[in-house]
Amino acid sequence: MLSADFLHLEKDVEMVNLNADIFHLDVMDGVLVPNISYGFPVVEAIAKKATKTLDVHLMIVHPEKYVERFAQVGAGMISFHLEASDRDGTDPAGILAQIRSDGVKSGLAINPDIPVERVYPYLKDADFILVMSVFAGFGGQKFIEDTYGRVRAVKAEIARQGLSCRIEVDGGVSPSNASALAQAGAEILVAGSAVFKAENPADVISKMKSDDIA
């Protein structure tokens, strides 16, 4: 929703309700990432109109302080960055458990410069891994091509551990790469600019959903 028209947000919420499966909400604090987006009031307002799951992506420091509140205002999925735990000196497994204890699907996100192997110890604690295909913090960036290999590697490790953890990809996603991402193992694709800047957003979503992904 970062690329939505915030002056006419209800219209875009209804479009997502009718065509997509998940609302992806980017929460940025200007500390972990350079940009600032929105917080509880916007998420809560969207939750009141949304008929699909709210996937809240926390690009913030100390996400453990805010997980419960985001769950209360309507999040059904919450992810946070491994880089936040590195910065804060917190245990990712503990935060993932906290998210689950609030009745929400738990996710761990990594930027393109973080080795994917670093998420392997936490696959059993996470419901999904968010593989960023751009650097977190701004919408409209160009898709990073080595994301395909990173997704394949995480998918193989999930299978090796015998887990059901899903893979989400966010950043520069469009109909031109959706099929290849699905083939690599992605099950949830986040498309912002490709959808909201399109002349026919519903058509773009339909093209990507034809690849059997969320």
Give residue spans per PLM region.
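Alpha/beta catalytic cores of nucleotide-metabolism and tRNA/nucleoside-modifying enzymes
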Residues: 161-169, 174-178, 182-214
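Short acidic loop-to-helix transition motifs that present clustered carboxylates
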Residues: 113-115, 174
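Conserved beta-strand segments that form the floor/walls of ligand-binding pockets within enzyme
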Residues: 79, 109, 130-133, 168, ...
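Strongly charged, low-complexity linkers/loops
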Residues: 134, 140-141, 162-164
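Internal catalytic-core helix/loop-beta-alpha segment
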Residues: 105-109, 113
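Short glycine- and Lys/Arg-enriched binding-loop motifs that mark or flank ligand-binding interfaces
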Residues: 26, 35, 133-136, 167-168, ...
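Short, glycine/charged-rich beta-strand-loop motifs at protein surfaces that mediate ligand recognition
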Residues: 139-144, 170
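Conserved N-terminal beta1-alpha1 strand-loop-helix module at the mouth
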Residues: 1-79, 83-93, 98-101, 106, ...
